[in-house]
Amino acid sequence: MSLFKLLLVLPIIALTACGFTPVYGTDGTANVLMSNVLVQGPKTRNGYLLTKQLETRLGRTTDPRFDLGLEITTTLDTLNINAKGDIERYNLIGSATYTLHDKQTGEITASGKVNSFTGYSATGTTVATQAAQQDAQKRLMIILADLIITNLIATADLPK
């Protein structure tokens, strides 16, 4: 066996020996969450967009094991002002605080806060600027949902 092949196989053997299991495998953490999480009902457009992405990634459920509570905050920052004093670019900053409750035990299984941002340009028309802002909101909620799911899979104390 060549040295290259040996160096390629060695890490795989080490991973299996230490009890490594893929998070999306049959015994992985992500499997416990799939179609088992009920996201609280959204109250705002951002809440709807975040809930939609979470349900797309985790699946919708009729008999949930977990409840996911969310609090979303967003702020708008000015990034660029032209010589006339008009704002040309905005930064949309968002954060989501989440709490995952196990309905069977009543315990908080995971909680945390995720932050991210996205930007958009203010063009010459109001309609185009509003469309860009709505697209930025959608992108931001997708990013926050993906961060929440990543954190849940990585840190939640979930039953196997």
Language-model features, listed with the residues they occupy:
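Sec-exported extracytoplasmic/periplasmic mature domains
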Residues: E55, G59, A145, I149-D157
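Post-signal peptide N-terminal segment of mature Sec-exported envelope proteins
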Residues: G28-T51
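Bacterial N-terminal signal peptides that target proteins for export
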Residues: M1-L7
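Bacterial signal peptide processing site
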Residues: G19-P22
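Surface-exposed short loop/turn segments
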Residues: P64-K113, F117-D135, I142, D146
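C-terminal motif of bacterial Sec signal peptides marking the signal peptidase cleavage site
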Residues: A14-A17
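Amphipathic, coiled-coil-like alpha-helical scaffolding segments used for oligomerization/assembly
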Residues: A136, L140, N151-K160
